[in-house]
Protein backbone atom coordinates (compact mmCIF):
# COMPACT_ATOMS: atom_id res chain seq x y z
CA UNK A 1 0.00 0.00 0.00
CA UNK A 2 1.22 3.48 -0.90
CA UNK A 3 0.13 6.49 1.16
CA UNK A 4 1.03 10.16 1.17
CA UNK A 5 2.83 11.02 4.41
CA UNK A 6 2.36 14.66 5.42
CA UNK A 7 5.43 14.43 7.64
CA UNK A 8 7.77 13.66 4.72
CA UNK A 9 5.62 15.37 2.05
CA UNK A 10 5.87 12.33 -0.19
CA UNK A 11 4.15 9.10 -1.11
CA UNK A 12 5.62 6.19 0.80
CA UNK A 13 5.30 2.43 0.93
CA UNK A 14 3.32 1.63 4.07
CA UNK A 15 5.37 -0.61 6.36
CA UNK A 16 3.56 -1.24 9.67
CA UNK A 17 5.41 -1.43 12.97
CA UNK A 18 3.73 -4.78 13.59
CA UNK A 19 2.14 -6.61 10.66
CA UNK A 20 -0.04 -8.50 13.13
CA UNK A 21 -1.62 -5.34 14.56
CA UNK A 22 -1.78 -2.12 12.56
CA UNK A 23 -2.55 0.87 14.79
CA UNK A 24 -4.42 4.01 13.71
CA UNK A 25 -5.49 7.13 15.58
CA UNK A 26 -7.93 9.61 14.03
CA UNK A 27 -9.20 12.85 15.54
CA UNK A 28 -12.94 12.49 15.99
CA UNK A 29 -15.72 14.99 16.68
CA UNK A 30 -16.02 17.74 19.26
CA UNK A 31 -19.56 17.02 20.40
CA UNK A 32 -21.24 20.40 20.86
CA UNK A 33 -23.49 20.23 17.76
CA UNK A 34 -24.53 17.88 14.97
CA UNK A 35 -21.65 16.71 12.76
CA UNK A 36 -21.10 19.01 9.78
CA UNK A 37 -20.17 17.72 6.35
CA UNK A 38 -16.51 18.75 6.70
CA UNK A 39 -16.07 16.56 9.77
CA UNK A 40 -18.04 13.79 8.13
CA UNK A 41 -15.85 13.73 5.05
CA UNK A 42 -12.92 12.94 7.33
CA UNK A 43 -14.85 10.13 9.05
CA UNK A 44 -15.73 8.52 5.69
CA UNK A 45 -12.15 8.78 4.40
CA UNK A 46 -10.68 6.99 7.40
CA UNK A 47 -13.49 4.46 7.29
CA UNK A 48 -12.21 3.52 3.82
CA UNK A 49 -8.67 3.22 5.21
CA UNK A 50 -9.94 1.02 8.05
CA UNK A 51 -11.77 -1.25 5.58
CA UNK A 52 -8.69 -1.54 3.36
CA UNK A 53 -6.29 -2.31 6.20
CA UNK A 54 -8.65 -4.99 7.49
CA UNK A 55 -8.29 -6.75 4.13
CA UNK A 56 -4.50 -6.42 4.05
CA UNK A 57 -3.65 -7.27 7.68
CA UNK A 58 -4.96 -9.75 10.29
CA UNK A 59 -5.72 -7.12 12.94
CA UNK A 60 -6.29 -3.37 12.90
CA UNK A 61 -6.74 -1.27 16.04
CA UNK A 62 -8.57 1.88 15.04
CA UNK A 63 -8.97 4.61 17.66
CA UNK A 64 -11.24 7.56 16.92
CA UNK A 65 -11.56 9.86 19.90
CA UNK A 66 -14.43 12.01 21.09
CA UNK A 67 -13.58 15.47 22.41
CA UNK A 68 -16.19 15.88 25.14
CA UNK A 69 -14.59 18.78 27.03
CA UNK A 70 -14.04 22.01 25.14
CA UNK A 71 -14.91 25.72 25.26
CA UNK A 72 -17.66 25.25 22.65
CA UNK A 73 -19.27 22.47 24.68
CA UNK A 74 -19.15 24.64 27.79
CA UNK A 75 -20.78 27.54 25.91
CA UNK A 76 -23.64 25.32 24.70
CA UNK A 77 -24.13 23.87 28.18
CA UNK A 78 -24.20 27.34 29.74
CA UNK A 79 -26.64 28.71 27.15
CA UNK A 80 -29.00 25.77 27.69
CA UNK A 81 -28.60 25.61 31.48
CA UNK A 82 -27.22 22.06 31.30
CA UNK A 83 -24.07 20.35 32.49
CA UNK A 84 -21.54 19.26 29.88
CA UNK A 85 -22.58 15.61 30.13
CA UNK A 86 -26.14 16.40 29.04
CA UNK A 87 -24.80 18.19 25.97
CA UNK A 88 -22.21 15.61 24.99
CA UNK A 89 -24.54 12.62 25.52
CA UNK A 90 -27.01 14.11 23.05
CA UNK A 91 -24.48 14.84 20.33
CA UNK A 92 -22.49 11.63 20.73
CA UNK A 93 -25.72 9.71 20.11
CA UNK A 94 -26.54 11.90 17.11
CA UNK A 95 -23.02 11.55 15.71
CA UNK A 96 -23.12 7.76 15.85
CA UNK A 97 -26.58 7.69 14.27
CA UNK A 98 -25.50 9.97 11.42
CA UNK A 99 -22.26 8.11 10.73
CA UNK A 100 -24.23 4.87 10.72
CA UNK A 101 -26.43 6.30 7.98
CA UNK A 102 -23.24 7.07 6.02
CA UNK A 103 -22.38 3.35 6.38
CA UNK A 104 -19.27 4.01 8.48
CA UNK A 105 -17.96 1.10 10.51
CA UNK A 106 -17.49 1.57 14.23
CA UNK A 107 -13.85 2.05 15.27
CA UNK A 108 -12.19 -0.48 17.56
CA UNK A 109 -12.41 1.99 20.44
CA UNK A 110 -13.99 5.43 20.72
CA UNK A 111 -12.48 6.93 23.90
CA UNK A 112 -13.75 10.14 25.43
CA UNK A 113 -11.39 12.81 26.70
CA UNK A 114 -13.14 12.98 30.08
CA UNK A 115 -12.43 9.29 30.62
CA UNK A 116 -8.68 9.85 30.29
CA UNK A 117 -7.98 12.78 32.62
CA UNK A 118 -5.62 10.70 34.78
CA UNK A 119 -3.48 9.87 31.74
CA UNK A 120 -3.33 13.55 30.81
CA UNK A 121 -2.20 14.51 34.31
CA UNK A 122 0.56 11.91 34.21
CA UNK A 123 1.80 13.17 30.82
CA UNK A 124 1.79 16.78 31.99
CA UNK A 125 3.83 15.85 35.08
CA UNK A 126 6.38 14.11 32.84
CA UNK A 127 6.65 17.19 30.63
CA UNK A 128 7.22 19.43 33.66
CA UNK A 129 9.83 17.06 35.09
CA UNK A 130 11.66 16.87 31.74
CA UNK A 131 11.76 20.67 31.42
CA UNK A 132 9.29 20.90 28.53
CA UNK A 133 6.47 22.55 30.48
CA UNK A 134 6.17 25.27 33.12
CA UNK A 135 3.56 26.60 35.56
CA UNK A 136 2.30 30.17 35.63
CA UNK A 137 -0.67 31.19 37.82
CA UNK A 138 -1.97 27.61 38.05
CA UNK A 139 -1.80 27.27 34.26
CA UNK A 140 0.60 24.75 32.75
CA UNK A 141 2.14 25.71 29.39
CA UNK A 142 4.19 23.65 26.95
CA UNK A 143 7.50 25.33 26.08
CA UNK A 144 7.81 25.01 22.30
CA UNK A 145 11.42 26.27 22.31
CA UNK A 146 12.38 23.24 24.42
CA UNK A 147 11.65 21.03 21.40
CA UNK A 148 14.04 21.90 18.53
CA UNK A 149 12.00 19.95 15.96
CA UNK A 150 8.85 22.00 16.59
CA UNK A 151 7.30 22.87 13.21
CA UNK A 152 8.51 19.83 11.29
CA UNK A 153 5.00 18.51 10.59
CA UNK A 154 3.67 21.76 9.14
CA UNK A 155 7.02 22.60 7.54
CA UNK A 156 7.35 26.13 8.90
CA UNK A 157 9.62 27.77 11.44
CA UNK A 158 8.37 29.02 14.79
CA UNK A 159 7.94 32.66 13.75
CA UNK A 160 5.93 31.69 10.66
CA UNK A 161 3.74 29.45 12.77
CA UNK A 162 3.04 32.26 15.20
CA UNK A 163 2.20 35.02 12.75
CA UNK A 164 0.52 32.84 10.15
CA UNK A 165 -1.95 31.05 12.42
CA UNK A 166 -4.44 31.52 15.22
CA UNK A 167 -2.54 31.43 18.53
CA UNK A 168 -3.86 32.51 21.89
CA UNK A 169 -1.73 35.28 23.39
CA UNK A 170 -1.84 34.81 27.16
CA UNK A 171 -0.10 36.60 30.00
CA UNK A 172 2.71 34.59 31.54
CA UNK A 173 3.84 32.73 28.45
CA UNK A 174 7.59 32.49 27.85
CA UNK A 175 6.92 32.45 24.12
CA UNK A 176 3.78 33.51 22.18
CA UNK A 177 3.55 30.02 20.65
CA UNK A 178 3.51 28.17 23.97
CA UNK A 179 0.21 26.36 24.41
CA UNK A 180 -1.92 25.33 27.38
CA UNK A 181 -1.69 21.86 28.85
CA UNK A 182 -3.84 22.58 31.92
CA UNK A 183 -5.93 25.64 32.80
CA UNK A 184 -7.52 26.63 36.13
CA UNK A 185 -11.26 26.22 36.59
CA UNK A 186 -13.61 29.18 36.34
CA UNK A 187 -16.86 29.59 38.27
CA UNK A 188 -18.66 28.37 35.15
CA UNK A 189 -16.49 25.22 35.05
CA UNK A 190 -17.42 24.45 38.64
CA UNK A 191 -21.10 25.00 37.93
CA UNK A 192 -21.14 22.86 34.77
CA UNK A 193 -18.96 20.04 36.20
CA UNK A 194 -16.27 20.70 33.60
CA UNK A 195 -13.22 20.55 35.89
CA UNK A 196 -11.09 18.06 37.81
CA UNK A 197 -8.54 18.13 40.66
CA UNK A 198 -4.86 18.25 39.72
CA UNK A 199 -1.46 18.97 41.33
CA UNK A 200 -1.82 22.53 39.96
CA UNK A 201 -5.32 23.12 41.29
CA UNK A 202 -8.80 22.32 40.05
CA UNK A 203 -9.02 22.84 36.30
CA UNK A 204 -9.36 21.20 32.91
CA UNK A 205 -7.04 20.07 30.13
CA UNK A 206 -6.02 21.94 27.01
CA UNK A 207 -7.20 20.47 23.73
CA UNK A 208 -3.88 19.14 22.43
CA UNK A 209 -2.93 17.03 25.45
CA UNK A 210 -6.21 15.14 25.16
CA UNK A 211 -5.25 13.36 21.93
CA UNK A 212 -1.71 12.61 23.09
CA UNK A 213 -3.14 10.98 26.21
CA UNK A 214 -5.78 8.92 24.42
CA UNK A 215 -3.44 7.71 21.67
CA UNK A 216 -0.86 6.68 24.29
CA UNK A 217 -3.46 4.98 26.48
CA UNK A 218 -4.80 2.83 23.63
CA UNK A 219 -1.88 2.49 21.20
CA UNK A 220 1.31 3.11 23.19
CA UNK A 221 4.21 5.49 22.59
CA UNK A 222 4.45 4.76 18.85
CA UNK A 223 1.82 3.76 16.32
CA UNK A 224 1.43 3.56 12.57
CA UNK A 225 -1.00 6.18 11.26
CA UNK A 226 -2.40 9.45 12.58
CA UNK A 227 -5.25 10.91 10.54
CA UNK A 228 -7.37 14.04 10.52
CA UNK A 229 -8.43 17.03 8.47
CA UNK A 230 -5.95 19.46 6.94
CA UNK A 231 -7.27 22.14 9.28
CA UNK A 232 -5.83 20.16 12.22
CA UNK A 233 -2.27 20.00 10.88
CA UNK A 234 -1.40 23.19 12.76
CA UNK A 235 -1.57 23.85 15.58
CA UNK A 236 -3.31 20.71 16.86
CA UNK A 237 -1.24 17.95 15.27
CA UNK A 238 1.99 19.92 15.50
CA UNK A 239 1.43 20.32 19.23
CA UNK A 240 0.43 16.69 19.69
CA UNK A 241 3.62 15.55 18.01
CA UNK A 242 5.81 17.88 20.07
CA UNK A 243 4.39 17.05 23.49
CA UNK A 244 4.28 13.29 22.83
CA UNK A 245 7.88 13.15 21.63
CA UNK A 246 8.96 15.21 24.66
CA UNK A 247 7.03 13.03 27.11
CA UNK A 248 8.61 9.92 25.59
CA UNK A 249 12.13 10.92 24.44
CA UNK A 250 12.69 7.73 22.41
CA UNK A 251 9.35 8.04 20.63
CA UNK A 252 8.49 9.42 17.20
CA UNK A 253 4.75 9.18 17.99
CA UNK A 254 3.09 8.44 14.60
CA UNK A 255 5.08 7.03 11.68
CA UNK A 256 2.66 8.22 8.97
CA UNK A 257 0.47 11.34 9.04
CA UNK A 258 -2.54 11.57 6.71
CA UNK A 259 -4.62 14.72 6.19
CA UNK A 260 -7.76 15.05 4.09
CA UNK A 261 -8.51 18.25 2.17
CA UNK A 262 -10.81 21.15 2.97
CA UNK A 263 -14.51 21.23 2.14
CA UNK A 264 -16.29 24.36 0.91
CA UNK A 265 -19.95 25.09 0.15
CA UNK A 266 -20.57 26.85 -3.17
CA UNK A 267 -16.87 27.81 -3.20
CA UNK A 268 -17.07 29.53 0.18
CA UNK A 269 -15.73 28.45 3.54
CA UNK A 270 -18.50 26.86 5.56
CA UNK A 271 -19.66 29.23 8.28
CA UNK A 272 -22.78 29.77 10.38
CA UNK A 273 -22.47 33.51 9.78
CA UNK A 274 -22.68 32.95 6.00
CA UNK A 275 -25.69 30.68 6.42
CA UNK A 276 -23.98 27.80 4.60
CA UNK A 277 -23.18 25.61 7.61
CA UNK A 278 -24.44 22.15 6.61
CA UNK A 279 -24.79 19.22 8.96
CA UNK A 280 -25.30 15.62 7.93
CA UNK A 281 -28.51 15.60 9.94
CA UNK A 282 -29.86 18.56 7.92
CA UNK A 283 -29.04 16.84 4.64
CA UNK A 284 -30.58 13.55 5.72
CA UNK A 285 -33.72 15.30 6.94
CA UNK A 286 -33.98 17.15 3.61
CA UNK A 287 -34.21 13.82 1.78
CA UNK A 288 -30.60 13.42 0.64
CA UNK A 289 -29.66 9.83 1.34
CA UNK A 290 -26.61 8.89 3.35
CA UNK A 291 -25.37 6.84 0.42
CA UNK A 292 -25.43 9.94 -1.80
CA UNK A 293 -23.41 11.90 0.77
CA UNK A 294 -20.88 9.09 1.02
CA UNK A 295 -20.65 8.78 -2.78
CA UNK A 296 -19.85 12.50 -3.03
CA UNK A 297 -17.01 12.14 -0.53
CA UNK A 298 -15.58 9.15 -2.41
CA UNK A 299 -15.81 10.87 -5.81
CA UNK A 300 -13.02 13.34 -4.97
CA UNK A 301 -9.54 12.25 -3.90
CA UNK A 302 -9.21 12.66 -0.16
CA UNK A 303 -6.25 15.07 -0.38
CA UNK A 304 -8.02 17.42 -2.78
CA UNK A 305 -10.47 20.16 -1.77
CA UNK A 306 -14.14 19.32 -2.23
CA UNK A 307 -16.83 21.87 -3.04
CA UNK A 308 -20.36 20.95 -1.98
CA UNK A 309 -23.10 22.33 -4.22
CA UNK A 310 -26.42 21.34 -5.79
CA UNK A 311 -24.77 20.06 -8.98
CA UNK A 312 -22.51 17.74 -7.01
CA UNK A 313 -25.52 16.30 -5.18
CA UNK A 314 -27.51 15.91 -8.41
CA UNK A 315 -24.61 14.21 -10.22
CA UNK A 316 -24.08 11.79 -7.33
CA UNK A 317 -27.78 10.89 -7.29
CA UNK A 318 -27.78 10.27 -11.05
CA UNK A 319 -24.59 8.19 -10.84
CA UNK A 320 -26.04 5.99 -8.12
CA UNK A 321 -29.28 5.67 -10.11
CA UNK A 322 -27.25 4.34 -13.04
CA UNK A 323 -25.48 1.82 -10.84
CA UNK A 324 -28.71 0.65 -9.20
CA UNK A 325 -30.40 0.40 -12.60
CA UNK A 326 -27.91 -2.33 -13.49
CA UNK A 327 -29.28 -4.49 -10.67
CA UNK A 328 -32.70 -4.71 -12.37
CA UNK A 329 -32.34 -8.39 -13.27
CA UNK A 330 -33.79 -10.24 -10.31
CA UNK A 331 -36.18 -9.38 -7.51
CA UNK A 332 -34.29 -11.62 -5.09
CA UNK A 333 -31.42 -10.69 -2.81
CA UNK A 334 -28.29 -12.21 -4.30
CA UNK A 335 -25.96 -14.26 -2.11
CA UNK A 336 -22.42 -12.92 -2.41
CA UNK A 337 -20.46 -15.70 -0.69
CA UNK A 338 -19.06 -17.06 -3.96
CA UNK A 339 -17.52 -13.77 -5.16
CA UNK A 340 -14.77 -11.46 -3.90
CA UNK A 341 -14.21 -7.72 -3.98
CA UNK A 342 -12.72 -6.79 -7.34
CA UNK A 343 -8.91 -6.74 -7.38
CA UNK A 344 -9.16 -3.50 -9.36
CA UNK A 345 -10.96 -1.82 -6.45
CA UNK A 346 -8.34 -2.99 -3.95
CA UNK A 347 -5.54 -1.81 -6.26
CA UNK A 348 -7.11 1.65 -6.52
CA UNK A 349 -7.33 1.98 -2.75
CA UNK A 350 -3.79 0.71 -2.23
CA UNK A 351 -2.63 3.65 -4.34
CA UNK A 352 -3.06 6.40 -1.73
CA UNK A 353 -6.77 5.62 -1.31
CA UNK A 354 -7.72 6.59 -4.86
CA UNK A 355 -11.48 6.41 -4.34
CA UNK A 356 -12.40 8.37 -7.53
CA UNK A 357 -10.64 5.70 -9.57
CA UNK A 358 -12.43 2.99 -7.59
CA UNK A 359 -15.77 4.68 -8.35
CA UNK A 360 -14.82 4.71 -12.05
CA UNK A 361 -14.20 0.96 -11.84
CA UNK A 362 -17.74 0.48 -10.51
CA UNK A 363 -19.13 2.30 -13.55
CA UNK A 364 -17.02 0.11 -15.84
CA UNK A 365 -18.64 -2.88 -14.16
CA UNK A 366 -22.08 -1.41 -14.89
CA UNK A 367 -21.17 -1.11 -18.58
CA UNK A 368 -20.04 -4.75 -18.55
CA UNK A 369 -23.35 -5.81 -16.97
CA UNK A 370 -25.43 -3.86 -19.49
CA UNK A 371 -23.54 -5.41 -22.42
CA UNK A 372 -23.73 -8.98 -21.14
CA UNK A 373 -26.27 -11.10 -23.05
CA UNK A 374 -25.86 -14.31 -21.04
CA UNK A 375 -28.05 -14.12 -17.92
CA UNK A 376 -25.70 -16.22 -15.76
CA UNK A 377 -22.76 -14.03 -16.68
CA UNK A 378 -24.84 -10.91 -16.05
CA UNK A 379 -25.81 -12.13 -12.56
CA UNK A 380 -22.17 -12.96 -11.78
CA UNK A 381 -21.08 -9.45 -12.83
CA UNK A 382 -23.85 -7.96 -10.67
CA UNK A 383 -22.68 -9.94 -7.64
CA UNK A 384 -19.11 -8.71 -8.07
CA UNK A 385 -20.42 -5.15 -8.45
CA UNK A 386 -22.47 -5.38 -5.26
CA UNK A 387 -19.62 -6.98 -3.30
CA UNK A 388 -17.14 -4.33 -4.47
CA UNK A 389 -19.52 -1.43 -3.90
CA UNK A 390 -20.41 -2.75 -0.43
CA UNK A 391 -16.69 -2.71 0.37
CA UNK A 392 -16.75 1.02 -0.44
CA UNK A 393 -19.81 1.42 1.78
CA UNK A 394 -22.45 1.85 -0.93
CA UNK A 395 -25.07 -0.21 -2.83
CA UNK A 396 -26.70 -1.78 0.21
CA UNK A 397 -30.27 -1.47 -1.14
CA UNK A 398 -32.11 -3.59 -3.67
CA UNK A 399 -33.02 -1.73 -6.84
CA UNK A 400 -36.69 -1.76 -5.76
CA UNK A 401 -35.83 -0.11 -2.43
CA UNK A 402 -33.62 2.47 -4.10
CA UNK A 403 -36.20 3.52 -6.67
CA UNK A 404 -39.16 3.14 -4.26
CA UNK A 405 -41.20 1.22 -6.86
CA UNK A 406 -44.82 0.65 -5.87
CA UNK A 407 -48.01 -0.54 -7.61
CA UNK A 408 -49.56 2.79 -8.54
CA UNK A 409 -52.17 1.68 -11.09
CA UNK A 410 -52.52 5.12 -12.72
CA UNK A 411 -48.82 5.21 -13.51
CA UNK A 412 -48.83 1.63 -14.77
CA UNK A 413 -51.80 2.44 -17.01
CA UNK A 414 -50.00 5.46 -18.51
CA UNK A 415 -46.90 3.36 -19.14
CA UNK A 416 -49.09 0.77 -20.90
CA UNK A 417 -50.68 3.49 -23.06
CA UNK A 418 -47.24 4.81 -23.95
CA UNK A 419 -46.10 1.34 -24.97
CA UNK A 420 -49.17 0.90 -27.21
CA UNK A 421 -48.56 4.33 -28.76
CA UNK A 422 -44.98 3.35 -29.62
CA UNK A 423 -46.19 0.03 -31.04
CA UNK A 424 -48.65 1.91 -33.26
CA UNK A 425 -45.99 4.39 -34.36
CA UNK A 426 -47.58 7.32 -32.51
CA UNK A 427 -44.34 8.63 -31.04
CA UNK A 428 -45.74 12.09 -30.32
CA UNK A 429 -48.30 10.55 -27.98
CA UNK A 430 -45.59 8.38 -26.42
CA UNK A 431 -43.46 11.48 -25.79
CA UNK A 432 -46.43 13.35 -24.30
CA UNK A 433 -47.09 10.51 -21.86
CA UNK A 434 -43.42 10.43 -20.87
CA UNK A 435 -43.58 14.17 -20.19
CA UNK A 436 -46.80 13.78 -18.15
CA UNK A 437 -45.07 11.16 -16.01
CA UNK A 438 -41.96 13.30 -15.71
CA UNK A 439 -44.10 16.18 -14.47
CA UNK A 440 -45.38 13.80 -11.78
CA UNK A 441 -41.79 13.06 -10.78
CA UNK A 442 -41.77 9.66 -12.52
CA UNK A 443 -38.65 8.74 -14.49
CA UNK A 444 -38.80 5.99 -17.14
CA UNK A 445 -36.07 3.68 -18.37
CA UNK A 446 -36.81 1.44 -21.36
CA UNK A 447 -35.11 -1.95 -21.32
CA UNK A 448 -33.97 -3.91 -24.40
CA UNK A 449 -36.57 -6.61 -23.73
CA UNK A 450 -39.41 -4.11 -24.17
CA UNK A 451 -40.18 -3.64 -20.50
CA UNK A 452 -40.04 -0.25 -18.82
CA UNK A 453 -38.59 0.47 -15.39
CA UNK A 454 -39.96 3.48 -13.54
CA UNK A 455 -39.09 5.23 -10.33
CA UNK A 456 -39.83 8.41 -8.44
CA UNK A 457 -37.10 11.02 -8.83
UniProtKB/Swiss-Prot annotation:
<dbReference type="GO" id="GO:0008270">
    <property type="term" value="F:zinc ion binding"/>
</dbReference>
<dbReference type="InterPro" id="IPR032678">
    <property type="entry name" value="tRNA-synt_1_cat_dom"/>
</dbReference>
<keyword id="KW-0479">Metal-binding</keyword>
<feature type="short sequence motif" description="'HIGH' region">
    <location>
        <begin position="29"/>
        <end position="39"/>
    </location>
</feature>
<keyword id="KW-0547">Nucleotide-binding</keyword>
<dbReference type="GO" id="GO:0004817">
    <property type="term" value="F:cysteine-tRNA ligase activity"/>
</dbReference>
<keyword id="KW-0963">Cytoplasm</keyword>
<dbReference type="InterPro" id="IPR015273">
    <property type="entry name" value="Cys-tRNA-synt_Ia_DALR"/>
</dbReference>
<dbReference type="InterPro" id="IPR014729">
    <property type="entry name" value="Rossmann-like_a/b/a_fold"/>
</dbReference>
<feature type="binding site">
    <location>
        <position position="272"/>
    </location>
    <ligand>
        <name>ATP</name>
    </ligand>
</feature>
<feature type="binding site">
    <location>
        <position position="211"/>
    </location>
    <ligand>
        <name>Zn(2+)</name>
    </ligand>
</feature>
<dbReference type="InterPro" id="IPR015803">
    <property type="entry name" value="Cys-tRNA-ligase"/>
</dbReference>
<comment type="similarity">
    <text>Belongs to the class-I aminoacyl-tRNA synthetase family.</text>
</comment>
<keyword id="KW-0030">Aminoacyl-tRNA synthetase</keyword>
<dbReference type="GO" id="GO:0006423">
    <property type="term" value="P:cysteinyl-tRNA aminoacylation"/>
</dbReference>
<feature type="binding site">
    <location>
        <position position="240"/>
    </location>
    <ligand>
        <name>Zn(2+)</name>
    </ligand>
</feature>
<keyword id="KW-0648">Protein biosynthesis</keyword>
<dbReference type="InterPro" id="IPR024909">
    <property type="entry name" value="Cys-tRNA/MSH_ligase"/>
</dbReference>
<dbReference type="Pfam" id="PF09190">
    <property type="entry name" value="DALR_2"/>
</dbReference>
<feature type="short sequence motif" description="'KMSKS' region">
    <location>
        <begin position="269"/>
        <end position="273"/>
    </location>
</feature>
<keyword id="KW-0436">Ligase</keyword>
<protein>
    <recommendedName>
        <fullName>Cysteine--tRNA ligase</fullName>
        <ecNumber>6.1.1.16</ecNumber>
    </recommendedName>
</protein>
<dbReference type="Pfam" id="PF01406">
    <property type="entry name" value="tRNA-synt_1e"/>
</dbReference>
<dbReference type="GO" id="GO:0005829">
    <property type="term" value="C:cytosol"/>
</dbReference>
<comment type="subunit">
    <text>Monomer.</text>
</comment>
<feature type="binding site">
    <location>
        <position position="236"/>
    </location>
    <ligand>
        <name>Zn(2+)</name>
    </ligand>
</feature>
<feature type="binding site">
    <location>
        <position position="27"/>
    </location>
    <ligand>
        <name>Zn(2+)</name>
    </ligand>
</feature>
<dbReference type="GO" id="GO:0005524">
    <property type="term" value="F:ATP binding"/>
</dbReference>
<dbReference type="InterPro" id="IPR009080">
    <property type="entry name" value="tRNAsynth_Ia_anticodon-bd"/>
</dbReference>
<keyword id="KW-0862">Zinc</keyword>
<keyword id="KW-0067">ATP-binding</keyword>
